[in-house]
């Protein structure tokens, strides 16, 4: 039996993992995705400005460090596992069950599932799956791959316009198609992309994807006007789909442990990351409490708070907070290496 099971491997879950390890707790970390990082993996190239003391840098760089930190104390990690139930069997005895039927036991549970399981909405076009490993994209991992390319973006929201704005600076051309009369993203961003010669095509959708000779890459796209039905075919090097996300949050509605909720979509926190069930804590975007702000920096704070509360639940005579890292014995040897690196 582990001390704590953390459900969710985004920034809050990862920091909870680190801080629980710092407090000498054994940790199990479960995530439904194939990689850790949560929603931060959706915008790897975006620049993050609002983490205190951290210079602005691409999200993927912050994510790399966050994962490294979260794994520092060697938690037991389970990826590609969807949690379907949390059962409190007794005080300091919880069962966490996955869709595959695995049952994991721990003394406490921390829920850090963000806004739930997030998957990009797929393009509903016949044969689309054959291009997903080549030049059809649902997430922009790197802007550099679009240098000097003709790029099509389907979607009119903020994310689509953000991508159009950034890619237009290096691409040969960028075209944005969307079904409505106007984009739903910020008006200021529409002006910015227009100034970069991004072609905006209202009331237009992707009807067909035309592959190359071996059907491994998209070579042309058949576009259709949603009102007239008129079509035309255009050559593109890459196609990006930005149709929003499907979110699955059934764990909270179906679990045996019925938690008090805020607006039916977030766990109600009582002053902090404490939930209505002793021994279950919630951190990050999934929890609502009076001091809540939806920032990565706040997710870190939530994670530490949840780990501290789990520690005192498991061990009532433990200190309410851990020692600051600058004076913590657990980092003594690692600190020597860091000091030597900077001095010599």
Swiss-Prot record:
It catalyses: 2 reduced [2Fe-2S]-[ferredoxin] + NADP(+) + H(+) = 2 oxidized [2Fe-2S]-[ferredoxin] + NADPH. FAD binds at residues 12, 31, 39, 43, 83, 118, 285, 326. Keywords: FAD, Flavoprotein, NADP, Oxidoreductase. Its cofactor is FAD. Its EC number is 1.18.1.2. It holds the Pfam family Pyr_redox_2. Homodimer. Belongs to the ferredoxin--NADP reductase type 2 family. This is Ferredoxin--NADP reductase. The lineage of its organism: Bacteria, Bacillati, Bacillota, Bacilli, Bacillales.
């Amino acid at each position: 039996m582990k001390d704590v099971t953390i459900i969710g491997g985004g920034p809050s879950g990862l920091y909870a993992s680190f801080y629980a390890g710092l407090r000498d707790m054994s940790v199990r970390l479960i995530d439904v995705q194939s990689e850790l990082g949560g929603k931060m993996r959706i915008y790897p190239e975006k620049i993050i400005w609002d983490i205190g003391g951290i210079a602005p840098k691409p999200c993927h760089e912050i994510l790399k460090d966050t994962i490294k930190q979260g794994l520092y104390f060697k938690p037991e990690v389970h990826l590609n596992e969807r949690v379907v139930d949390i059962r409190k069997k007794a005080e300091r005895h919880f069962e966490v069950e996955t869709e595959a039927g695995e049952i994991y036991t721990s003394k406490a549970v921390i829920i850090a599932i963000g806004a739930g399981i997030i998957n990009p909405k797929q393009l509903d076009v016949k044969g689309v799956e054959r291009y997903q490993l080549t030049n059809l994209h649902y997430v922009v991992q790197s802007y550099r791959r679009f240098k000097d390319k003709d790029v099509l973006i389907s979607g009119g929201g903020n994310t689509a316009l953000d991508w159009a704005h950034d890619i237009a600076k290096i691409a040969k051309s960028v075209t944005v198609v969307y079904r409505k009369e106007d984009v739903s993203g910020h008006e200021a961003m529409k002006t910015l992309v227009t100034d970069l010669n991004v072609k905006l095509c209202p009331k237009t959708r992707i009807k067909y994807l035309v592959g190359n000779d071996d059907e491994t890459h998209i070579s042309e796209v058949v576009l259709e006007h949603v009102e007239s039905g008129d079509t035309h075919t255009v050559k593109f090097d890459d196609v990006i789909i930005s149709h929003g996300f499907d979110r699955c949050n059934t764990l909270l509605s179906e679990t045996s442990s019925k938690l008090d909720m805020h607006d039916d979509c977030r766990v109600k926190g009582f002053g902090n990351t404490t939930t209505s069930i002793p021994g279950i804590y919630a951190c990050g975007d999934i929890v609502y409490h009076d001091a809540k702000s939806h920032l990565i920096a706040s997710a870190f704070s939530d994670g530490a708070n949840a780990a501290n509360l789990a520690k005192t639940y498991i061990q009532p005579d433990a200190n309410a907070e851990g020692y600051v890292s600058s004076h913590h014995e657990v980092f003594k040897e690692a600190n020597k290496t860091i000091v030597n690196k900077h001095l010599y």
